[in-house]
Amino acid sequence: MYAFYSLLIYIFYSLFRRDGGAAAVSDPGDPTQKSGGQPRGRRRPDQFTSELWSELNSLAGCSESEDGQKGAEGGAAEVSLEEALMRLAEFLSVQLGAEESCGTTPDLGKPGEVPPLLTVTSQLLALLAWTRSPRGRQALLQGTQPTCPVQPSTLDGSLSQEESSSQPTPILDEVPRDETQEHQPLQLEEEQRVWQRLEQLILGQLEELRQQLEQQEEELSRLRLGVGVTDSEKRVQHLTLENEALKQSLSLTRDLLLHWGPGPLPRLSQEEAGALLELQGQLQEAQDTTEALRVQLGAQELQLQGLRGALRQLQQETEQNCRQELQQVHGQLAGLRARMASLRQGCGDLRGLVSTFTQSCQGSLSEAQGQVSWALGALSAGKAKTQLSEGNQAPPTGCSGRLLELKGNIRVLCRLRPAEGQPSSLVSVEPGQGGTITTCYRGRQHCFRLDWVFPQDASQEEVFRQLEPAVLSCLQGYSVCIFTYGQTGTGKTYSMEGPPEDPGIAPRALQLLFREMGTGGHHHVTLSMVEIYNEAVRDLLATGPPERLVVRQGPAGQGGIQVAGLTHWDVPNLETLHQMLSLGRSNRATAATVMNQHSSRSHALVTLTLRAASPPRPQGITGTLHLVDLAGSERVWKAGVASPVQRDPNGARRLREAQAINRSLLALGGVMAALRARRPHVPFRDSQLTRLLQPALWAGTTAVLLLQISTRAEDLGETICSLKFAERVGQVELGPARRRRAPRSGTPSSLSTDTPLTGTSCTPTPSPGSPPSTSPNSCSGLTLEPPGDPPP
């Protein structure tokens, strides 16, 4: 914008300097303004730029030709008119192109849409074109005042009217000098009128510029109230540039008026001069306001930067504080979690103390009841001393009950197989109650302490004497389980069954029970015998071929298990019982291995149910005796079943049997570990063996483990494993033994919530004999019954 005004002022300066600074008056009769002898009409606003450009080019050509002729007189100009006009025209083209590119191309067909800058520029170019014409030169030489055209259309219209009315001759020199002087006053008057009219138009243009200035000031005042600092700054800059442009235009117009007017413009009235001064004051005020706004904008920018910095710092501080608070909350949460864990542990410890205290109280109560029963039993034994012929062989029933309770619910007895030849020095034994077994294996010494350790030369009678109190407790309504455990070939079946000339635990226990029942009231004995072979349950007392039985959980509310298809035999006397046991032993699966010629390949379970009822009461107590002969744990490479093709055609079967035996014994170890740790879930369902032993290993029962070990050096590793298992089993606590009532439905029951063990003795009564018969009941489900009173 400033470059344009500088260029424009430079053009006029050069022009006035070349022409001597003289003024000119437009001649309405100039023949050079004609085009082909025809008067020109008013040009349309949209044709102004192109026509004006053509006129400027023609005028530039004329100027160059004339300047060439008068070069000697006037001298060369500082800048050519053609170059100045080209610069001015290029600026106008760029200005119009910029407006078109911004999407604000003015409609030149409407007078209100023409920009003021373009209007003023057009007026100046029109004036410049007139001064370069021959008539303008003549007017300048005469020193008359020009009628500066404000609008090209006005100038063109006036020129056209003058041309059409005057009809000048093509040769100006031929006009006489006197005639020219005669017409000069008329010309001056007419030109004076034209000058006044053009002066009014210029004053109107000045008023329009003043109004635009006021609009810009109003726009500037509106921008002061705006919120967006960046947009306001851009708008202020734009308005400042427009304000400068308007000031330059106003100054240029004022200078032109002063230069072309008659001296110091004597014709301007005081009001016009005051208006001009007022406009100048408003312009100065607008400049001051713009500068103040610029200063205020800078201050606001600084304030905004400060606010942004403060906001950024506040955000950082808030974020840091939130992170610190979050870390503190996490730390407090971790502390609360640790506190909660400690409280839970303390609660568990308190529960354990309460449980221990409860058990201690129950134990003290049971001990007191046992002492009372001991006294009553001793009194009864003193009265019946003369009536018992074999009183010295077995202790009274009350004594056995108290002794069983004092020794604990689970006892571990250990029996060593007699060594063949020289005894091994790797195993040392301290027999007796609380005896120890010390082994030396791979340079390390292991010591195990058990409830009772038998010497190597212990007889079957000595072994049974330790189990006799537990067997007799069945007559009082308790559930007892005796099972043998150990490596294959260590004598488990020998200790449980024994030969006919030296019977084992099972024949002696049955003989003792029938002897005691023969002197008491009415007793009903039921027998069942099963084996677990390759995880299949088979009935050893079935009349037909053995079938695989299905083990199910008992009905809801009754507990226990049920074996569908299992037969229960009523046993009237001892002879029938021995016959049935012989039948079951003959049906059991046995085979020869490298370690044992008569190795049991299955687990055998004999269940004897005793129900006794006094004549006054229809419902009596029920006791259960479980005799379990477990198959021996074996290592397949030692038993000779690792390569079945080379050793035995049935080696594959022996291998499957060994794998099934080891898996079931491993499941039994898991059950014992869960019972020892008092876990809420005991994995009885991991094996068929543990499922059948669930009634015998539940709370309130009595269990006795007879461990069979070997003292041979090659069996020392398996012996240590068996001793470790027995030591863990000895730590299992099943709780106080409880008595059980017989169910009303007649189904054999194996476990219920009963009264604690007491030393009350049973009076033997003869039992009527009856032939063996098959019980209609076909399951061994266990029914829970409420506790009942002991028999009188």
From Swiss-Prot:
Tell me where it resides.
Cytoplasm, Cytoskeleton
Record region (Disordered): 22-45, 142-184, 734-792
Q: Which GO terms of the molecular function aspect are on file?
A: ATP binding; microtubule binding; microtubule motor activity
Pfam families membership: Kinesin
Which residues lie in Low complexity bias regions? 744-764
Looking up InterPro entries in the UniProt record yields: Kinesin-like_fam, Kinesin_motor_CS, Kinesin_motor_dom, Kinesin_motor_dom_sf, P-loop_NTPase
**Residues engaged in binding ATP:** 486-493
Q: Which ranges are annotated Pro residues under compositional bias?
A: 765-774
Question: Domain named Kinesin motor: which ranges?
Answer: 409-732
Tissue expression profile of the protein: Present in axons and dendrites of neurons in the central and peripheral nervous systems.
Please tell me whether the keyword Hydrolase is annotated for this protein: no
- State the similarity comment: Belongs to the TRAFAC class myosin-kinesin ATPase superfamily. Kinesin family.
- What's the protein name? Kinesin-like protein KIFC2
Give the originating organism: Mus musculus
The record lists the lineage as: Eukaryota, Metazoa, Chordata, Craniata, Vertebrata
Name the gene: Kifc2
